[in-house]
């Protein structure tokens, strides 16, 4: 597999989308593009669904011979079944998939690829990369590294912290490994525990309740997701704990960015970008390449950056579901 990372700025991605909208490529024959994504169970996946349907709208308007079918799944088995429907019923020749889970979707995606379908995997990578043609994602290493650096600096290299993880996926592993890699450089910081919160505010609330019961002093929390940060803050407030000075979420949800902008919660001091718009970008880039009879680079990584109160306005999109 080509290991070279093809870094694209959002500006470049936007330009690609405009080229599609302008009808820069024409299909020689009818093409069916299947899009498989999780259901909107929280604000980030709501953004994924919204951007996927936006891509469908833009592409079908620009290309009458292109059919885009968007399917959402509530769990991994349902998503695997939908892949078979897209293949046998809808006769797709191209697939863009945001896997519900990495391990359980790898074999179903591989089976689709073996039937000659071009496969672009988005965000949650598969455990076997030979099951895909292309991979488009945010910078998961930076997503873990930047918060770790910020927390370490804020704590002056000393303190007790807890961490939340998402769902067992390759991207969660990348984020956590990057986070702990930075923390290993700061011997004065102790990670008391890390547990999965499933990128869900209710699950994160329960995880944080457990942390608060077991640990009588916590300096900071890496919530690793803005939805999970909501659950974390709720648990802290209910427990009336004043020792926790910093809660770092992630992905740039509009509620979190608004809080960062207006300074209404001193525990929210920074964020890290990871917009669900990359779903739109992945679909548009894949369609553009396939309409031209071309392939995407093996890896397209969209940069993540630290969001501060000074830069928050650039990342605030009030009309977005995320």
Show which residues each predicted segment covers.
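N-terminal signal peptide c-region/cleavage motif recognized by signal peptidases
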Residues: 21-24
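A residue-level marker of the well-folded mature domains of exported/periplasmic proteins
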Residues: 3-6, 27-322
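Bacterial N-terminal signal peptides that target proteins for export
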Residues: 1-13
